[in-house]
Amino acid sequence: MTIRVFMVDDHALVRAGMRMILSGETDIEVVGEAESGEAALPLIRKLRPDVVLCDLHLPGVSGLEVTERVVRGKHARVIVVSVLEDGPMPRKLIEAGASGYVGKGGDSTELLRAVRDVARGKRYLAAGIAQKLALSGLDGSQSPFDELSPRELEIAMLLVQGLRQEDIARKLSLSPKTVNTHKSRLFAKLGIEDNIALARLASQYGLLDPALVL
């Protein structure tokens, strides 16, 4: 049985690299790709792939939101491919329904194993990520962002990137009032009062790629 894969990444070179790796396998077929969450979601609904490889940091709708929507609609299983291997994001993506999480620094063997395992209904975490998740539970170390819901965490990410509440509401198809409620709750949970404090905390705990923090 051929595993049908759809790729979502805003970098054409990354998509080309993954396509080259996947296309060399007789049991895997790349059925489509997109450079944004907005473009990907209707194509995923139409093409019905078995596995979606999704970047975390996408323009507009984030990888977290893509994961939630794809899983909620039962359109495919999702593997998140990200440069972030530390901080709360791997755990949050798994909580949001992702079936796998691999780092962009991994090799082709790891990517292929992730695709095959997830297509068979298993969960796959890159070894380094799985170890960090296990150790974070064993040594009692916690990030304040662990207390946030997946939606609150996504809104925190967008706030750190400099988006206004109105922009976030439009991107996530939420009302401005709902976004404001989530913002108030996440600020209270984190013990902060403004976006500057949020950006500092996010950078400290690995919530975002430091290059994205204003």
Locations of regions flagged by a protein language model:
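Recognition helix of helix-turn-helix DNA-binding domains
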Residues: 164-197
